[in-house]
Structures are given as C-alpha cells and as structure tokens.
Amino acid sequence: MRIASLQPSISLTLSYLGALDTICAATKWCVEALPELGERRTPLLPDSWSFAEADQSALLLTRPDLVIASVPYRPESLTAILKAGVPVLTLAPHTLADIYLDTRLIARQVDALPLAETLIEQLQSRLSHTTSTCSSLTAQTVYCEEWGKPLIASQPWIAELIAAANGGFVGKPGAQTTADAIALTDPDILFFSWCGAGDRVPMDRVIAQRNWQHLRAVRTGRVFCIPDEFLNTPSFNLLEGLDCITHALHPSHFPRHPRMKQLSAPTVAS
C-alpha cells in the first residue's frame, strides 16, 4: 500500500500504527510534525486546504494507491484531489469518538487494526485516569484558540481534553469569536495553539493588540502556547497536549511539558 498523506494527523497516525513506510507523499506540515519524513526525503504535496488541479501531476508521480485527506478542506481542493483519479479516503473528525473511528479506518488500510485498538484503549485509559485525578482539584475556565485572524476557538476534541482536566471551555468549540467576547468571560487560563504555528505564537503581541492586559489569566501569568501538533493534529500525540493542559491547570500535581511556553506575569512597580 502506498499512501499520500495530506494532513499531519494522517502521517502521525500511520507512524503510531507502525506503517510509516506506506507514506509515499506528504505535506510540509507533516514533516514539521514528523521530521523523519524529511529525513526520508518524502515527496511533498500541498495539503487538503491548498491542493489545486495543477498539483495533480505531482500527486500521480508518487504513484499512490490511496490518498487520505482530512479537515480543514476547501471544496475546490477536495474536487481537485478527487479528479486526480486516485482512490481517496476523506476524514472530518470533530470529537474524540470521531478520532477513534478515523483511526480504525486508517488502520484497516494497513492491516493494523489490533494495534489501533490497543492505542485507542491506552488513550481512553489515560483520559479516564486524568478525569479521576482532576475531579477533586480546582475547576477553572479556559479559552483555547486555534486561529488568531479571525479568532477561532479550538476544536471539540480539545474541549474534551480540557474537560478531563476539570477545565471549563470558554465559548463554542470550533466557532469564530471576538476579543471582546473572550474578555467578558475573563478566563482563568489562556491557551494559544495556532494551526501551522508550532510553538511560535507571539503571545505578548497578541495580548497587547487585543487589550487583554487586564484579564485574570494575563495578570497571573497563566497564558500558554501549546505546540500546534499537540492539539490540532487529531492523533495519539494528543496525549502530549493533555500533558500541557493538566500542568497549566494544576501545576503542583502534573509535571511541565518541556515544549510548552508560558507568558510571564507583568511586573508590578513598587
């Protein structure tokens, strides 16, 4: 089986399933999430948001048996992928339950369903343990953002991770919002995990541009950048995102993930 993977979550899932060798093409975002693809000099293609008819020849040169694409899509890009004439599996997860189903779909393509079930059980067990541990700890409100212009709150599966850590998700997951609307909720914690930004969200500049200096999270230094691939790529690396979330909410009970970044609280003049 030769698979063209058009989103990082697909590449990561195949890697977790021990099927990295099936990837015959990927995207630059896949390489950022999984550097081994770069080391292998895997041919690069546009993702399922930017793929165009002009990219069909490059896709066909990689001789895929199957293209696997996932959200986010553009209708024009999906049409161009389908017109290439290669079988396409399209995924659109919203919840953790969707992610489990998608994992099984991918696993069936590479004869790895037993391993997929084991990985799913491990993730579910970890979430159950987190929920049990955090249920007696202080509940807190959390705003988590996947995009800054316009402001878009993170996806429902991330709200589920936050809920497992006894956090209340501010706003509607996956929906567009405004700086003023978030300011009115005055959340305890701010998470930034912008798609494609890795761990490079300029938190201090964002806070200043939105006039959020007065928010509780800013005043107490509880503003964090969580690497994009830990939250926005729906695969088993979500466990690393959960590590970041649990530490941010309950720092005395959970260790700090080395890749999460924190904005310091402002210095108060004496």
Residue ranges and their predicted role:
Residues 1-270:
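N-terminal ligand-binding lobe of clamshell/alpha-beta domains
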